[in-house]
Amino acid sequence: MQSSMTMELRPSGDSGSSDVDAEISDGFSPLDTSHRDVADEGSLLRRAEMYQDYMKQVPIPTNRGSLIPFTSWVGLSISMKQLYGQPLHYLTNVLLQRWDQSRFGTDSEEQRLDSIIHPTKAEATIWLVEEIHRLTPSHLHMALLWRSDPMYHSFIDPIFPEK
């Protein structure tokens, strides 16, 4: 079977440009993927709801007080996950990464973070933020965030608390 390819040239939508947009067609109509988008959306909503419901069930550790040395927020969170055997919420992981990124270009960028912020205060801050993230976000908000971030899985911890 022989397929004919056509290319349609049309002026670019930018009126100040002399560029031309090209659309290539193989002569077949595009597949209707709207049903897949709706199914994916429903699946994402269900996953977000299950995730948020699960995170609400995980208790914040009460026996804390270890002095954990750390050079970055993400590094501290990794140590906390190992020490307490608990996951941190997606939103907490994203926030901690952003806090680390916010140090880029500062005078203290190369300085150990535990020499700037006392380890006990830093850990308490993470647990306070974690409690907010476990108890308050809606699964609808989570699904919207996940839909906009194709790599959202990388911020979801695979650690499950031991009971």
Swiss-Prot record:
Alphabetical list of Gene3D superfamilies matching this protein: RDM1 protein domain
MF terms in GO: DNA binding
One GO CC term, this protein: nucleoplasm
Major localization listed first in the record, in broad terms: nucleus
The UniProt record lists the keyword DNA-binding: yes
Compartment list: Nucleus, Nucleoplasm
Domain of life: Eukaryota
Keywords: DNA-binding, Nucleus
Phenotype of gene-disrupted mutants: Impaired accumulation of siRNAs, reduced DNA methylation, and loss of transcriptional gene silencing at RdDM target loci. Impaired RNA polymerase V-chromatin associations (Pol V).
Region annotated Disordered, chain positions: 1-36
GO biological process terms on file: gene silencing by siRNA-directed DNA methylation; siRNA processing
Subunit structure: Homodimer. Interacts with AGO4, RPB205 and DRM2. Part of the chromatin-remodeling complex (DDR complex) that contains at least DRD1, DMS3 and RDM1. The DDR complex recruits/activates the RNA polymerases V and acts during siRNA-directed DNA methylation (RdDM).
Function description: Regulator of RNA-directed DNA methylation (RdDM). Binds to single-stranded methyl DNA. Involved in the assembly of RNA polymerase V (Pol V) transcription initiation or elongation complexes at the chromatin, as a component of the DDR complex.
Protein's recorded name: Protein RDM1
